[in-house]
Curated annotation (Swiss-Prot):
<feature type="active site" description="Nucleophile">
    <location>
        <position position="158"/>
    </location>
</feature>
<dbReference type="GO" id="GO:0050126">
    <property type="term" value="F:N-carbamoylputrescine amidase activity"/>
</dbReference>
<feature type="active site" description="Proton acceptor">
    <location>
        <position position="43"/>
    </location>
</feature>
<feature type="active site" description="Proton donor">
    <location>
        <position position="115"/>
    </location>
</feature>
<dbReference type="InterPro" id="IPR045254">
    <property type="entry name" value="Nit1/2_C-N_Hydrolase"/>
</dbReference>
<protein>
    <recommendedName>
        <fullName>Deaminated glutathione amidase</fullName>
        <ecNumber>3.5.1.128</ecNumber>
    </recommendedName>
</protein>
<dbReference type="InterPro" id="IPR003010">
    <property type="entry name" value="C-N_Hydrolase"/>
</dbReference>
<dbReference type="GO" id="GO:0110050">
    <property type="term" value="F:deaminated glutathione amidase activity"/>
</dbReference>
<keyword id="KW-0378">Hydrolase</keyword>
<feature type="domain" description="CN hydrolase">
    <location>
        <begin position="1"/>
        <end position="253"/>
    </location>
</feature>
<comment type="function">
    <text>Hydrolyzes deaminated glutathione (dGSH, 2-oxoglutaramate) to alpha-ketoglutarate (alpha-KG) and cysteinylglycine, alpha-ketoglutaramate (a-KGM), and no activity on glutathione or L-glutamine. May function as a metabolite repair enzyme.</text>
</comment>
<comment type="similarity">
    <text>Belongs to the carbon-nitrogen hydrolase superfamily. NIT1/NIT2 family.</text>
</comment>
<dbReference type="GO" id="GO:0033388">
    <property type="term" value="P:putrescine biosynthetic process from arginine"/>
</dbReference>
<dbReference type="Pfam" id="PF00795">
    <property type="entry name" value="CN_hydrolase"/>
</dbReference>
<dbReference type="InterPro" id="IPR036526">
    <property type="entry name" value="C-N_Hydrolase_sf"/>
</dbReference>
<dbReference type="InterPro" id="IPR001110">
    <property type="entry name" value="UPF0012_CS"/>
</dbReference>
Length: 272
């Protein structure tokens, strides 16, 4: 692992696949021009509409998204963490996986994860979200991809961040960097987003790269923004605020080693 710049992109995706991919391309280009070697895209970057719309277009979204990610990685010679996007479930009409993927600069897929924790909640602002109505939960733990260049990358998606046992599993598999792409609601995000990300970073002494959605996507769907990169001590290295853009910061193996030596909590676990 070497020091490198990572970027967490922040988008306002809408129910328009073509426009969303165009926005994503512009932000990837911006990140690469600023020196990023690892670029993260938020949950629902390719399409953010209601669940019925998303399911009706799931095959088209998945096909276009996979081609787009391969093309972007090759064109910009950058590693891309992307998720999630809908991927149809074979033999299950009316269901798709919420999928994250890791793409190498040559366009090869290095890792894939289907979100296991589905967002079925009644938010106090009056909105109800029932992800399981159209999304099939993944059945496997998320992967940790072991990279000589970028460290060990652990995948997750949005609502997963509320389940610390998932990230403890990733840390036990050697994760150095935790990927948390999200479309956090505006209501929950203002109180929970930053706290949860810092907690996952601190308790696992890992970097966190958290791309995000922001703003108004369609009627009654507003997201929090604040894409972030956080160091293993819980320090916020970059915050994209509330407008589309990016958070960019250095991932440094010396800092990772320093924190783990100064606060060796992973070595002190009793209940493992």
């Amino acid at each position: 692992m070497k020091p490198y710049l990572a970027a967490a992109l922040q988008m306002t995706s809408r129910p328009n696949l073509t426009e969303n991919l165009q926005e994503a391309e512009e932000l990837i280009d911006l990140a690469v021009r600023q020196g990023a070697e690892l670029v993260g895209l938020p949950e629902n970057f390719a399409f953010l509409g209601n669940e019925t719309e998303k399911l009706e277009q799931a095959t088209a979204i998945a096909t276009a998204t996979e081609k787009f990610l391969q093309t972007m990685a090759q064109r910009f010679q950058v590693t891309i963490l992307a998720g999630g996007f809908p991927f149809p479930v074979a033999g299950e009409a009316g269901k798709a996986y919420n999928t994250a993927t890791l793409i190498a600069p040559n366009g090869q897929e290095l890792a894939r994860y289907h979100k296991v924790h589905l967002f079925d909640v009644n938010v106090p602002d009056g909105n109800t979200y029932w992800e399981s109505a159209t999304v099939m939960a993944g059945q496997k733990y998320p992967p940790v991809y072991h990279s000589d260049s970028f460290g060990n990358l652990g995948l997750s998606i949005c609502y997963d961040v509320r389940f610390p046992e998932l990230y403890r599993y990733l840390s036990r598999q050697g994760a150095d960097v935790l990927f948390v792409p999200a479309a956090f609601t505006a209501y929950t995000g203002k109180d929970h987003w930053q706290v949860l990300l810092q907690a996952r970073a601190i308790e696992n002494t890992c970097y966190v790269i958290a791309p995000a959605q922001t703003g108004c996507h369609y009627e009654r769907r507003h997201t929090h923004g604040h894409a972030m990169i956080i160091d293993p001590w819980g320090v916020i290295l970059a915050d994209a605020g509330e407008k589309p853009g990016l958070a960019i910061a250095e991932i440094n193996p010396d800092r990772l080693k320093q924190v783990r030596q100064q606060m060796p909590s992973l070595q002190h676990r009793v209940f493992v």
